[in-house]
Structure formats: structure tokens, C-alpha cells
């Protein structure tokens, strides 16, 4: 049975973003994310378990970040929950039926000829790249890309836009880079400093990029 994401309800859920104390600690204290990026991405948070559709029971655990996924024109596709509590619960949750693909697609419309577009493994690393002044999207796995995403990155970018990535310093990170390299041969890999497991850690330590 096909299940449609209740984007009308989800829009009301994130219309007026709230950053609770747990979210503020995670975003600003731990990750050092620029508040302007939090606003640009429309990140919100919840302190009580919350449904993902108007007549449903609680779906998103609390406390959680609410992370909107949008298409290139800003239309809401779904909202991912990112659990920040200490109980043994799933860290990431999407409403059933979500088909979101790449994260932060609206940044594509801000690219100019000759720009760099950076690829992160997940939203939090994407926020770090954005906070560092880079234009970035996130692709958690090569299999999460939609056909439209692949077409967009291959043929829909302004002239001269180059693709870049700091692969995570682990086996899954290198595998993702290699998988994406098959789709996008022009993708350029960059090496993180020794001891940094991902770009988010690199960014919050304040290390300057070479």
C-alpha cells in the first residue's frame, strides 16, 4: 500500500521553528553551527513526543531535532527526526513513505558558474560545511540518491560548478566517496586531518582548511 507523507501537517509543525535547550546545546555548543545556518535550513526541535501526521499517534521521540527535507524550489518533501535523548531509541526517523534523496537541495538554486558544491555524508556535517561558508548538500548513501538527484548533479548545475567532498575517516565514508565517484567522476576528494573523524569534528575544532 502506498503511503503519502502528510506534508501539510509537517509544514505546520515546522512553520515557526523552536530551538529548545537540548537542540541549542547540540547545535551551538557541541557542533558550533552558525545560527544563520540553523535558520536557513529551517531546523526546529520538540520537547514532547509528536505525531508525523495530523491524526496519528506520537512518532517523533523527544527531545529531537526536526530536519526539513525540501526540493530545489523549497517545497517540503518530509521531515526527519534526530533523537537527542539518552534512551535506547532510533536516532533518525522519517515518516513512512518519505522519498527525499539528497539533503539541502535548495542550495542548488544559489550556485553560480564556477562555484564549488560540497557533499557531506549527513545533515550535521552539511551544517558544518555551510557554517564554514561553503555551499553544501548531504548524501547519506549512494543508494539514497533519486534519479532526479543524479540528473541534477550531472546536468543541472551552472557551468563550471565543481563537486568536492571530505570523506569521513572510516570505511563507510570511503565507500560512499568511491560509490559517488562512479556516478560523478569529476568529484574531488579532500583528506581530513589525522584524528578528525568527519568534517563536523574538523569544523568545530576550528582547524583552517588548506
Per-range role (PLM):
Residues 1-66, 70-73, 108-113:
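TOPRIM metal-binding catalytic domain and adjacent DNA-binding surface shared by DnaG-type primases
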Residues 32-33, 134, 185:
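Short phosphate-binding/catalytic loops that engage adenosine nucleotides
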Residues 54-56, 151-155, 198-210:
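Short, surface-exposed amphipathic charged segments that create phosphate/polyanion-binding patches used
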Residues 119, 160-172:
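Acidic beta-strand-to-loop metal/phosphate-binding motif
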Residues 153, 175-185:
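Short, aromatic/basic amphipathic alpha-helical patches
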